[in-house]
Amino acid sequence: MRLAPLPIPTRVYRGENVDSYSRRHAARNHCAPSDVDRALREHGILITKARLHPVRLQAWRALGRLRATAFTTPERILDEEVTERALCRHCTRGERARGRLPELGMVCLRHRRWLGSPQVDLHGYHPALVAERQFRHHLAARNVLHDSLPMLIGRDCANPAIIGHNEIAHRRDRTSINDPWALTYPEQVKIARLLTRPTFLGIVTDPDVDETQRHTLATREVEKIIPARDDAHPWRATNRVWTATTHLTARRRDARIHGTPIRDTYYNILRLI
C-alpha cells in the first residue's frame, strides 16, 4: 500500500528524530502521532508499536514526503550512544525539535548559539565560536562526541572554580553571558583535544616512561590551557587529567599481558594513539 503524504507539509530538520518530527507533523495536520500510528496499524502497515521500527520510520518519511536520509543518524558511534538533544531554536525557527547531531559540539555556528539549556546568544564571545570550529575539525572528525569521555573530563577541568572566579567574572561582564559552561567552553575543548592528541597520549600513558616524567608533562600541558593566575587552581585540572591518564596507562599495561584492553569509554581514547 502506497502512503499519501499528509496534506500540510512539515520540514524536517537536520538530525531530527522521528518522535520529534512525527509530533510536529501531526500537530500541523491537526492530529496526534498516536492517531496516525493507530491508523497505520489498522490498515496493516504497522505490525508493531516499536517507535524505531524501520517500517514506522519509512511510513513517516512517506507521510512527510521526506528523503530516504531522514531519521538515519546513527544511534551509536564506536559503541558510544549519540545523545538526543534539543536542536538550535533558530535553526528550527522557534519550534521545539530534538535529534542527534554527532558532528556538532555545543555551538550552532550558523546562528552563534549555545546549545545548552537554556540556549543563549554567543555573538559577543568569539572564543566559544573558535572552540566549536576546533571541536568539529579535531574531535568530531575523529568520532569524539560532544558528551564523550574526553569532553566530560574537559568540562570537569573547565570548572569555574578551577579557572578562577575573577576570570569568569571578567568574561561575564564583557559578554553579558551568564552560563558558566558557555564561558568555559574554550577550555573544555582544549582539554579534550589534549586528551586525544596522539603525541601526548603516547607518552603520558606509556607504562615504560617514568611516572615523574609523565606527570610533569601532564602538568605542563594543562597549565598551558589553564594558567596559574589570580584565584585559578590549575592543579585540580591536572589531577583530573592525571587520574584519567593513570586509568589509560593501566589499560595499556594490562593489554600487554592479556591482549586487547577492556573495551570501555577509556578504550575509545586509546584508539586515538
Question: Where on the chain are the PLM-derived regions?
Answer:
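Basic, alpha-helical nucleic-acid-binding regions used in initiation and control of genome expression
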Residues: 1-273
